[in-house]
Amino acid sequence: MSVESMVQGMIDALTDALGDAAKHDKGNSAAGTRVRKAMQGAKAAAQNVRAQVQGDKNSR
């Protein structure tokens, strides 16, 4: 998988979380849980991107 597609996947996931973030700001607690879950996924995806970039760098 390319780094570009990995980053695009992160962007798509975070864009999807915007709706829940707005609901959370209006007081919806369940939406806040979904936002936290999306952020945890973004953290994991960012770690994968970092590992991929480092691996690519080391192999060049």
What are these regions (language model features)?
Residues 8, 32-37:
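Short, charged, amphipathic alpha-helical segments
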